Amino acid sequence: MSAVSTQKDTEKKANLVLPVKEAGGKSNGTVELPAEIFDVTANIALMHQVVTAQLAAARQGTHATKTRGEVSGGGKKPYRQKGTGRARQGSTRAPQFTGGGTVHGPQPRDYSQRTPKKMIRAALHGALSDRARNDRIHVVSELVAGQTPSTKTAKNFLAELSDRKKFLVVVGREDVTAWKSVANLQNVQPIAPDQLNTYDVLNSDDVVFSVEALNAFVHGPTEAAQEESK
């Protein structure tokens, strides 16, 4: 029994194979998507937790209200203590007065939540696996051929890949042509490989990788890039 279970544990899922597409519907070879990234079981609760934390961290948290001690004015007693028949008052900046301070109002705070890196990575892999199972991940050799940006070319190419509306385009930071080509396209979000996150994957209908960006995401930065960053 132990030998059988050990054999099953050592068995690995086969990598997914996708065609590398070019404009006009042509294919330029294939590329493998590692099963440990693009074919894992999606944990919905984990993805929800990670996305919630990401959106919370994006909040500015600069909201603020003034208490009666912070509102300008109100130093003088509005009327005498006794003899008026009215309730005694010490300041016109008390909460019950118009223009007075706020009680228990919002104050600046940090909404960020601590999320372990392993959880963030697992949630991202689950989101990518969900898109891969539904044929919503595409790999292209380059979004626009040449060095001249073209919004029209990029738009037509994305329309060939899918008839769905929202695209997450993962391209290398050095691919200026691709960044400029999709900058003005509605419902198309360009992103660098090291910025890929669970929320953006789930918020898009299709994820499009350039070959360069896919390699950078799967294998990490190259040695040359690491030397430049030092």
Curated annotation (Swiss-Prot):
InterPro entries: Ribosomal_uL4, Ribosomal_uL4-like, Ribosomal_uL4_dom_sf. Keywords: Ribonucleoprotein, Ribosomal protein, RNA-binding, rRNA-binding. Gene3D superfamilies: 3.40.1370.10. Disulfide bonds: none annotated. Belongs to the universal ribosomal protein uL4 family. One of the primary rRNA binding proteins, this protein initially binds near the 5'-end of the 23S rRNA. It is important during the early stages of 50S assembly. It makes multiple contacts with different domains of the 23S rRNA in the assembled 50S subunit and ribosome. Forms part of the polypeptide exit tunnel. This is Large ribosomal subunit protein uL4. It comes from Nocardia farcinica (strain IFM 10152). The lineage of its organism: Bacteria, Bacillati, Actinomycetota, Actinomycetes, Mycobacteriales.
